[in-house]
Swiss-Prot record:
GO biological process per UniProt: copper ion homeostasis; egg-laying behavior; IRE1-mediated unfolded protein response; multicellular organism growth; multicellular organismal reproductive process; response to copper ion; vulval development
GO MF, one example: copper ion binding
Function: Involved in copper homeostasis. Affects body morphology and length, egg laying and brood size.
Cellular component, GO annotation: cell junction; cytoplasm; cytosol; nucleus; striated muscle dense body
Pfam families reported for this sequence: CutC
Highest taxon of source: Eukaryota
Name of the protein described by the UniProt record: Copper homeostasis protein cutC homolog
Lineage: Eukaryota, Metazoa, Ecdysozoa, Nematoda, Chromadorea
PANTHER family the record matches: COPPER HOMEOSTASIS PROTEIN CUTC, COPPER HOMEOSTASIS PROTEIN CUTC HOMOLOG
UniProt KW Cytoplasm keyword: no
UniProt keyword annotations, A-Z: Copper
Phenotype when the gene is knocked out: Reduced copper tolerance, which results in reduced brood size and retarded body length, protruding vulva (pvl) phenotype.
Family: Belongs to the CutC family.
Keyword field contains GTP-binding: no
Length: 250
């Protein structure tokens, strides 16, 4: 007997970019980790060493690795795509079980060639189309193309600054393509709003950082960059637990 839509378990993906965050996310009950570096830049490709350690420490937790060479737009040239595909190959060997990627053309449509290259390189692992869809010119066509080229999921805030603002488009994505692709509602998701997001979007996956500020140790007066003046952010064990507790009875 198959599950009905209302009976499906609602799951939580936590994005992390450091080992402390990974430990807290797993201890809090995260169903999956989106593994990145530099979340303050929207998430970039993680190192092979980082993924290797996570795979060793948490063999039962799915690890979906961000593939994004640089910050900025999602229009990649040939050399950048070669580097992206090389990263996929090495991260597969390190223990990645899935990938997160998105590429657009300069006109704002899904770059089929680049996306197909990543999907083929990632096989047999699934690939999620990330929030590039939120800056696509036409999200409906972009989502149809994502399904057509073989993405298994899409991460979105509904083309708004937060998932809470984008609930109507997220709900429409879910209704239009139910059963064809998993829609992950993400950006600004927390324990105080996730119940409303479940009610309004009907998604079965939610994506959050569940992070809190952590003051950096003042080792010296020499700055390594602008981010030195900002507190780092670490996934909160309690916030992950509260998210899971809120999702469990829904």
């Amino acid at each position: 007997m198959t599950e009905t839509e209302s009976q499906k378990q609602i799951k939580l993906e936590i994005c992390i970019d450091n080992l402390e965050s990974a430990e807290n996310a797993v201890a809090g009950g995260a169903d999956r980790l989106e593994v990145c570096s530099a979340l303050q830049l929207g998430g970039l490709t993680p190192s092979v060493g980082f993924v290797s350690i996570l795979s060793y420490k948490y063999p039962d937790i799915p690890l979906y690795c961000m593939i994004r060479q640089r910050a900025g737009d999602f229009v990649y040239n040939e050399d950048e795509m070669a580097a992206n595909m090389e990263d996929v190959e090495w991260l597969k060997k390190a223990g990645a079980t899935g990938f997160v990627f998105g590429a657009l053309t300069s006109a704002g449509s899904l770059d089929r060639t680049s996306c197909q290259s990543i999907i083929e390189t990632a096989r047999p692992h699934p690939v999620t189309f990330h929030r590039a869809i939120d800056v696509a010119y036409d999200w409906k066509t972009c989502l149809e193309d994502a399904i057509d080229v073989g993405f298994k999921a899409v991460l979105t805030s509904g083309q708004e600054p937060s998932a809470l603002d984008g609930v109507y488009i997220i709900r429409e994505m879910q209704e239009l393509h139910k059963g064809k692709i998993d829609v992950l509602a993400g950006c600004g998701v927390n324990s105080s709003n996730v119940a409303n997001l479940v009610e309004w979007t009907k998604c079965h996956w939610y994506h959050a950082s569940a992070s809190v500020a952590k003051k950096n140790a003042p080792l010296n007066k020499v700055s390594m960059g602008k981010q030195d003046n900002q507190p780092s952010r670490v996934t909160s064990l309690e916030e992950v637990r509260m998210l899971k507790a809120t999702l469990a009875p829904v």
